[in-house]
């Protein structure tokens, strides 16, 4: 982004309705105005992808809050790496409540942003919390259920784990990705060689709090979540969906089907030549960043952003 001196990011924390402390970074704008709430993807931490996104919003004079989801990174919650999507939906609302207390933020202009798994979380949060002005969903996942032949096995293992925990044993954890780039619970979270390399080595490449594992119960919670049903309540909340043309983790045609099913007002942008993990990088990202900032700052009720 063009160079101009910006306020340094601030370490912040806020409380959730159920008493957890979530911690992250605030990137203050130069002047009072809109703000955006950003969380990383499935089992990811704030050092992965999203701090650069926050900086791009800050360059456009939009205050950005990035935080580690509950049980991850610097945020509270036990057991660790226990992914609870519905709780994460609720946490977006608590983050919005926190931002409303900051003098730099226009209380009437706070938006939600998510990528991949967190794009679904952000869409659900915006559907249920009408205080959110709009929602930006980047490469949302479209398959949240295990493969049919694996579903009975996954549920059986979840029940065995529940019985084990009741008598005092620690929660069972499994890798997010195997060496073959597959999710061991059969969820639609796959990766090619480059994507696998990034994810398993993120801990050693700037994200020391990242762990390539989740609790087994995370998948029970994922199966109990019905994100696509909740999205029908998005009516009157503006949505911008960014669809990477070459996405192999969440295929572009399936993202388009998801977009087509959303209520108006909505806007889709196809990121040409981009995949799931590089959609937010490259020389052309500045154009995409400006599009997103325009969407957040644009007039109420208008769902269009400038074309890249």
From Swiss-Prot:
Domain of life: Eukaryota
GO biological process, one term: antibiotic biosynthetic process
Main function: Thiohydrolase; part of the gene cluster that mediates the biosynthesis of brefeldin A (BFA), a protein transport inhibitor that shows antiviral, antifungal, and antitumor properties. The proposed biosynthesis of BFA involves formation of an acyclic polyketide chain that is differentially tailored throughout the backbone.
Regulation: induction: Coexpressed with the other cluster genes on brefeldin A production optimized medium.
Residues in the signal sequence: none
Keywords annotated in UniProt: Hydrolase, Virulence
GO molecular function, one term: hydrolase activity
Pathway stated in the Swiss-Prot or TrEMBL entry: Mycotoxin biosynthesis
The gene coding this protein: Bref-TH
Family to which this protein belongs: Belongs to the polyketide transferase af380 family.
Any one Pfam family match given in the protein's UniProt record, by short name: Hydrolase_4
Source organism (scientific name): Eupenicillium brefeldianum (Penicillium brefeldianum)
EC number: 3.1.-.-
Entry protein name: Thiohydrolase
InterPro entries in the cross-refs: AB_hydrolase_fold, Hydrolase_4, Polyketide_trans_af380
Enzyme class (EC, first level): hydrolase
